[in-house]
């Protein structure tokens, strides 16, 4: 079974940093994991991509030859990729029982305005038989501006509904969240599990009264759908990265269909059985 994780979110949310941290942790625990770059404008990586869209098409070349702007050029690059999926299939063909981390561009119009990323997710799931999921990152600094936070929740909801696959929402850069301006863990919790009713009054106090009705409509939509909550991500904490990886594994049912791997030395008579493990139940009696 093959697995693919689409790493999405707006520009500056920390997607590439998250990819690097996830790969480092996965390699530490012995997993075969590879980075796939789908950003034709990317130029720096902590890990060299195993598969790179720039080997197929480059944004700078498109902008120069077709005189497109950055966003138009990016959409053209993705359309070119989707018209040449045989290239991607050939690139992915050698990876069996592997875990692919797919770093996506930060232009959210790829899955909110035009159905490019959803088409790619469908291709991976149906044509190539990948178990596919997604993560969506927003910057923890959104918590400093409640209107911006609401916009982030809406974009996460849009991505989730557009992709049509299981998705985990992450509040990135939690290592930058300091206990200042009176912010407490309880207040941070209101953002991780958005409670629109608690936030509505604060927004209405700080915005023009003309927007109050719009704010109530947005809050009502978020509350009625109730599909977005955030897991805190601190890439400087191995425990935090491990927690995120565990949630991704659960979404894709990672490893449930894997066949036991036979040690190479078994046929040579050198195999030594590992110690037997026991399931010990602790019974606590009331005194």
Curated annotation (Swiss-Prot):
A Pfam family this chain is assigned to: ATP_bind_1
Matches recorded under InterPro entries: Gpn, Gpn3, P-loop_NTPase
**Subunit structure of this entry?**
Heterodimers with GPN1 or GPN2. Binds to RNA polymerase II (RNAPII).
Q: What is this protein's function?
A: Small GTPase required for proper nuclear import of RNA polymerase II and III (RNAPII and RNAPIII). May act at an RNAP assembly step prior to nuclear import.
> To which protein family does this belong?
Belongs to the GPN-loop GTPase family.
Q: Spell out where the chain crosses the membrane.
A: none
List the protein's name. GPN-loop GTPase 3
Q: Name one GO biological process term.
A: protein import into nucleus
Any one GO MF annotation of this record: GTP binding
Species for this entry: Cryptococcus neoformans var. neoformans serotype D (strain B-3501A) (Filobasidiella neoformans)
């Amino acid at each position: 079974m093959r697995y693919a994780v689409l790493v999405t979110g707006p520009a500056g949310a920390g997607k590439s940093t998250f990819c690097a941290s996830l790969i480092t942790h996965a390699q530490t625990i012995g997993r075969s994991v590879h980075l796939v770059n789908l950003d034709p404008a990317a130029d720096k990586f902590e890990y060299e991509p195993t598969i790179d869209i720039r080997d197929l098409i480059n944004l700078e070349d498109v902008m120069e030859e077709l005189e497109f702007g950055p966003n138009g050029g990016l959409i053209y690059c993705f359309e070119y990729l989707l018209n040449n999926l045989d290239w991607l299939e050939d690139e992915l063909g050698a990876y069996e029982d592997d875990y692919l981390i797919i770093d996506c561009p930060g232009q959210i119009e790829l899955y909110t305005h035009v159905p490019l990323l959803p088409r790619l997710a469908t291709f991976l799931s149906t044509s190539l038989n990948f178990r596919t999921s997604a993560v969506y990152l927003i910057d923890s600094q959104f918590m400093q501006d409640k209107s911006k936070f609401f916009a982030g929740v809406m974009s996460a909801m849009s991505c989730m509904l557009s992709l049509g696959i299981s998705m985990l929402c992450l509040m990135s850069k939690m290592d930058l969240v300091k206990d200042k301006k009176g912010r407490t863990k309880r207040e941070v919790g209101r953002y991780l599990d958005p409670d629109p009713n608690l936030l509505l009054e604060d927004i209405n106090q700080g915005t023009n009264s003309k927007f109050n009705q719009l704010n109530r409509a947005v809050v009502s939509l978020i509350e009625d759908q109730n599909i977005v909550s955030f897991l805190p991500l601190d890439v400087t904490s191995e425990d935090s990265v491990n927690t995120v990886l565990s949630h991704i594994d659960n979404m894709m049912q990672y490893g449930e269909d894997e066949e036991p791997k036979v040690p190479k030395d078994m046929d040579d008579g050198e195999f030594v059985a590992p110690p037997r493990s026991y399931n010990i139940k602790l019974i606590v009696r009331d005194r």
